[in-house]
Amino acid sequence: MAELLLGVNIDHIATLRNARGTPYPDPVQAAFVAEQAGADGITVHLREDRRHITDRDVRILRETLQTRMNLEMAVTEEMLNIACEVKPHFCCLVPEKRQEVTTEGGLDVAGQQEKIDNAVARLSQANILVSLFIDADKRQIDAAVASGAAYIEIHTGAYADAPDDETRQHEFERIRDAATYAAAKGLKVNAGHGLTYHNVLPIAALPEMHELNIGHAIIGRAVISGLKDAVAEMKSLMREARR
């Protein structure tokens, strides 16, 4: 079985930075650390409201990443222009609502086929690989195939947020069946949204999966796992100042 790739989403490094309007923590530095730790790619979502990642972040990351850049974006003229200028390795087209905390569902490709087809064609002409963030639904997979996109990313939110084991198993089976169906149609299959250290194993075990994009859980774990060293370093500096 081929190696499963990990795309690390660093949006919430920028969320923490922007909460205080400081230049730190720096998403570019975080991307470097993630790459050194084994990340196969870095994912960022340039939202229309710029609530975390900024245009400047995107441009610097494109110049400095040693792996691959996956730019998540809404299907708007502004974002298409930015993508065609910056030329990330991948663009993942996602739905976007300004009032949402995070992306709440998959892109309705079938319901806006012409718009998605045109976006995929435009990005492809700029030599950017395109992925469509969709729910585990055969109708959406068929629409993704028709669009000309090479990749889909299956939205795993319903699986991750399932209130009980029975519901989670049902959602897992939907993802499994969708992955099998999509792979048979010639699509490369990624997945992401809500994946954590506690629920990732069944998804990672699916042979059709090419890459998982995970962010919030990794950044949350990093805050806790790195807290001991961070506190100790600050205390050491304070002691040094009094010597």
Curated annotation (Swiss-Prot):
<comment type="function">
    <text>Catalyzes the complicated ring closure reaction between the two acyclic compounds 1-deoxy-D-xylulose-5-phosphate (DXP) and 3-amino-2-oxopropyl phosphate (1-amino-acetone-3-phosphate or AAP) to form pyridoxine 5'-phosphate (PNP) and inorganic phosphate.</text>
</comment>
<feature type="binding site">
    <location>
        <position position="102"/>
    </location>
    <ligand>
        <name>1-deoxy-D-xylulose 5-phosphate</name>
    </ligand>
</feature>
<feature type="binding site">
    <location>
        <begin position="11"/>
        <end position="12"/>
    </location>
    <ligand>
        <name>1-deoxy-D-xylulose 5-phosphate</name>
    </ligand>
</feature>
<dbReference type="InterPro" id="IPR004569">
    <property type="entry name" value="PyrdxlP_synth_PdxJ"/>
</dbReference>
<feature type="active site" description="Proton acceptor">
    <location>
        <position position="72"/>
    </location>
</feature>
<feature type="active site" description="Proton acceptor">
    <location>
        <position position="45"/>
    </location>
</feature>
<comment type="similarity">
    <text>Belongs to the PNP synthase family.</text>
</comment>
<feature type="binding site">
    <location>
        <begin position="215"/>
        <end position="216"/>
    </location>
    <ligand>
        <name>3-amino-2-oxopropyl phosphate</name>
    </ligand>
</feature>
<dbReference type="GO" id="GO:0008615">
    <property type="term" value="P:pyridoxine biosynthetic process"/>
</dbReference>
<comment type="pathway">
    <text>Cofactor biosynthesis; pyridoxine 5'-phosphate biosynthesis; pyridoxine 5'-phosphate from D-erythrose 4-phosphate: step 5/5.</text>
</comment>
<dbReference type="InterPro" id="IPR036130">
    <property type="entry name" value="Pyridoxine-5'_phos_synth"/>
</dbReference>
<keyword id="KW-0664">Pyridoxine biosynthesis</keyword>
<feature type="binding site">
    <location>
        <position position="52"/>
    </location>
    <ligand>
        <name>1-deoxy-D-xylulose 5-phosphate</name>
    </ligand>
</feature>
<feature type="binding site">
    <location>
        <position position="194"/>
    </location>
    <ligand>
        <name>3-amino-2-oxopropyl phosphate</name>
    </ligand>
</feature>
<keyword id="KW-0808">Transferase</keyword>
<dbReference type="Pfam" id="PF03740">
    <property type="entry name" value="PdxJ"/>
</dbReference>
<dbReference type="GO" id="GO:0005829">
    <property type="term" value="C:cytosol"/>
</dbReference>
<feature type="active site" description="Proton donor">
    <location>
        <position position="193"/>
    </location>
</feature>
<comment type="subunit">
    <text>Homooctamer; tetramer of dimers.</text>
</comment>
<keyword id="KW-0963">Cytoplasm</keyword>
<dbReference type="GO" id="GO:0033856">
    <property type="term" value="F:pyridoxine 5'-phosphate synthase activity"/>
</dbReference>
<feature type="binding site">
    <location>
        <position position="9"/>
    </location>
    <ligand>
        <name>3-amino-2-oxopropyl phosphate</name>
    </ligand>
</feature>
<dbReference type="InterPro" id="IPR013785">
    <property type="entry name" value="Aldolase_TIM"/>
</dbReference>
<feature type="binding site">
    <location>
        <position position="20"/>
    </location>
    <ligand>
        <name>3-amino-2-oxopropyl phosphate</name>
    </ligand>
</feature>
<protein>
    <recommendedName>
        <fullName>Pyridoxine 5'-phosphate synthase</fullName>
        <ecNumber>2.6.99.2</ecNumber>
    </recommendedName>
</protein>
<feature type="site" description="Transition state stabilizer">
    <location>
        <position position="153"/>
    </location>
</feature>
<feature type="binding site">
    <location>
        <position position="47"/>
    </location>
    <ligand>
        <name>1-deoxy-D-xylulose 5-phosphate</name>
    </ligand>
</feature>
